[in-house]
Amino acid sequence: KSKFISKFNEIKQKVKLEDGESVSIEIIEDDVCFCLSQGLVKKSCGGNGCNINDNDYATTAKELGIEKEVLMAIASQESKHASFKAVKQATILFERHKMYRLLIKKGNTKASVDALSKKYPSIVNEDSGGHNDMTSYEKLKIAKSIDYDCAIQSCSWGKFQVMGFHYANLYSSPRELEKAMNMCELQQFKYFVLYLKKTNGMVNALKSKNWEEIATLYNGPKWKEKNPEYANNIKRYYNQFKASK
């Protein structure tokens, strides 16, 4: 309780309000354990996060009626096993075209978003791409200064690279998603599993090992233009995992 009050007072001192003005401040404590609150573990991680183990893959695969190697293959394709870029910094990919669409969806006029696109073409853009001009975290920092929540939703997160705009599947806000993804590999897995369950046709594609359908559902109908080997890569990783049993 004392930590919470101290944190609140620290933030409150940084927020200056005019008379009659109010503000909503979201405080997510540093030592929160999302997995404990969701019933995934029996003991708090103390804010250090939990790792995925083979049993997590096996249990989820059984629940979905699929082979665990299919899940592992997707992880290998999406992030090459790298859940984190650094300590408490999830692997991300910032998508500038998602930022563009989310800003308009939020109610900004097309003219205002186009003006942002002209000023920050690598951050806000109608077209996808632009992944090599600066790092995703450099882009995210600038995007947050434009609109924090839209910025978080414009990234794919963690080991399985699920987009942030699916945050409501498991979290109360984009900021809570960011906290969970940066903290915990098991949260990245849980977020991924809920995405699979809520994506129409995905579980059936996983069951039948329809690699091209998986690629379409995971990356959109134009996946062959961006990564023509995506489906073959998943199949190859799957075969490697099966052979290593």
Give the predicted meaning of each segment.
Residues 1-245:
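Cell-wall glycan-active module
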